[in-house]
Every structure is written in structure tokens, then in C-alpha cells.
Amino acid sequence: LKRLLKIISNNKVLVKNFTSLSLLQLANYIFPVITLPYLVRVLGPEKYGLINFAAAFSAYFVIITDYGFNLSATQEISVNRNDKEKVSEIFSSVLTIKIILFFLSSGIFFLIVNMFELFSNDAGLYSIMFIGVVGIVLFPLWVYQGVEKMKYILIINVAIRSVTIVSIFLLVKVENDYLLLAVIYTITQVMTGITGLFFAIRKFDLRYLFPSKVQLLEQLKKGWNLFLSSIWINLYTTSNVFILGLFAPNSVVGYYSAADKVRIAFQGILSSMSQSVFPYVNKLLAESYQKFISFNRKLLKISVMIGIIISSSLFLFAEPIVKIVLGNEYSPSVIVLRIIAWLPLIIFLSNVFGIQTMLPLNYQKKFSQILFLAALINLMISFSIVPSYFEIGTAVSMLVTEIFVTLSFFIFIRMKRIPVI
């Protein structure tokens, strides 16, 4: 107990940010825990699957507009947090690039929706979901993370999501209300983005400094490898739902998506840990390599312990969890949940080896190369088995790919003699 109190005392900022992000993730995952059982029953597997397919499609444009800034800009702001002029310069350059990328994405989006019948048949739904990307473009998560003031994200998200939950229960009543649900999701994202942007400007005394071409190119260069990494990650995460939707009925997409939502809800603590720890480990590394290694060793032990508890619980109790949370109509989700139950443990390890160790040590290129190979493996497996095995094939593909990523990160840091283990 004394040792634990000492660790907390020596890492007050980290503990404070981790607590804020844990509460934020709790709020984020209470949201689906409250609404998921209601929505899967009201919408049914088909419409619920369609909504998730549309969300997976929109996620491609989120990847384009984010451009890896949630890591690269966070890292840069963390190092320069005491220089207000430099932080404003980074803020202005990154926001400008994200807005430009959004307009480029808009052109791509409208071309795809008008050219392919799969999308044009539900053009209204895809358009509504795409508008939500605006909110993600505007929300400067990388600023809050960089200055380690995550409690403000908590306040903004909880306030707006509370209104969203009430709106869903009041307005979404029947299967055909799926478009209304998409509108609610989009309004939530846009409101969060606008509120987060203006609050950050006022709270952190940010100024928009019209960026030069050199500054824009500098930010693009810094985020490039992480942008590629984001694309490769997306090809074996969000793309799984998208690929499944190309071959399977919407109802099958619903079975997989519902099981994955349950897994993500249980895995929520990882996002809190990753977001709060990343700027902290960068700061530690700037102070002392030994402190950096020592901290990541402790982080690894905690990750293994939490991962084993979460994954084994999901595997052992998959059937009652599906029955209680999703209902009898989603019985095919049980086997999916059992297969992907081990993802939390695997991803926890991957996070420590990759994001918290390789990226601070400037191994972005190798990080990106590993994820590129993972994306290729996932695509090969998916297009080989998903057409025949649908949701089971998607789950297997996801599991195999994540195992490959974690093992590759592990082998790399061992080869470089980085003593995290």
C-alpha cells in the first residue's frame, strides 16, 4: 500500500489525467451499455448492421482527416507546452490541414456514393454519417492530450452524451428510425467538436496564426508515418465490418458489430491508459531513458493483469453476456464474442510495445511497416474466408492479425535490446 501511495504521489499529473480519461471512457462506454440493448432490439440485426456499415465507411474519412495528428501533434505539444506561441503555431497548422483534408474527403465521398449502387441506395444515411466527420475534424483532442488537461474532455463529452442518450430513448422507437439515429449521432459529434474547439481556444489562450506553406509541410511530414499507420490499423479494424458488409447481409453485419461493441466496452480502459500515458512517457524519455524504461515495465505488468481478467471474463461468460445485453435474436454473436474475447489482452500488450515504447523512441517508420504487413495479412485472410464464413471469418481474421502485430512489436524491441521486458 505504501509503495502504491508513493507511485501515486510521484505521478500526480499522470494519475489525474488517467482518472479523468478513465471516467471519460466509463461515460463513453456507459453510453453503449445503456443504449446498445435498446437499439439492437428496436432496430433489429438488419438496420443495426446497416448503421454500423455506414459508420465503418465514414471511418475511412476520419482516418484521412486525423492524419495521425492525435499522436504526432500530441507529442509536439507535450514537448512545447510551456511555449504558448509554439503551441498556437502547431494548433493553427494542424487545424488548417485537417479542414483542407475534410474538403478533399468530401469530393471523394460524393464520387463513391454516386458511382456505386451499394451506397447510392442509402445515400441519405451515408451523407448524414459523413457530416459527423466535421465534429471530429474540429475537436482538438491532440491539444488536450498534449497539455495533459483531459478533465475538460470529460466534462464536454459527458454533458453532450447525456443529451444524446435521452434523445435516443425519446425519439428512436421503431426499426425505420435508423435515419433519425444517424442524425442524433451526427449532431452529437458536431456539437462536441465545436464546443471542444472553442473551449480549448479560450482555456489555453490559443491564437490562430495563419500558417506558412513551410509550417504546413512540416506538420504533414511529422504526421506522415503515423498517418500510414492509421490507414493500416483501419484496414484490420474498421475495415473488417466494411469487408463483411460487402459479402454478407446487413443482419450478419449486425451480429458481428454487436459482439464487437461488447468487446470494445470491456476494453475501454485501454483508451484511457493509452491517451493519458503517451504524453507522459514522452516527457519521461526527455528527462531520463532509465525512467522511461522503468515506467513502461510497470505499465506492461498492469496491462497483462488487466488484459487477462477482461479477456477470460469475456470468453467464459460470452453466452450470458450476449443474452442479457443483446437478446436472443443475436445468438450468432456468442461465438464471435468468444473468438474476439482475447483481443483486449493482445491489444494491451501491443499498445505497450508499440505506441508507448516504439513511437517515443522514434521508430515510427518500423511501426508503420509492421502495421502495413498486418493490413496485408488481414486483407488476404478476410477476402479468403469472409465470403464463406461471414462473421466467424471476420472474427478469426481480426484475432490472427492482432496476434501478428503484437508479436512483431515484441520481436522488434527485443532485437533492439530495449529492456521493457
Regions found by a protein language model. Give the residues of each.
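Hydrophobic alpha-helical transmembrane segments
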Residues: 123, 127-130, 154-204, 373-377, ...
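Membrane-water interface segments that mark the loop-to-transmembrane alpha-helix transition
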Residues: 16-28, 54, 59, 63-113, ...
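Interfacial segments at transmembrane-helix termini and the short loops linking adjacent helices
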Residues: 113-129, 316-346
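Signature of the first transmembrane helix
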Residues: 12-70, 106, 165, 225-251, ...
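Membrane-interface junctions at transmembrane-helix termini in multi-pass inner-membrane proteins
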Residues: 123, 134-156, 344-370
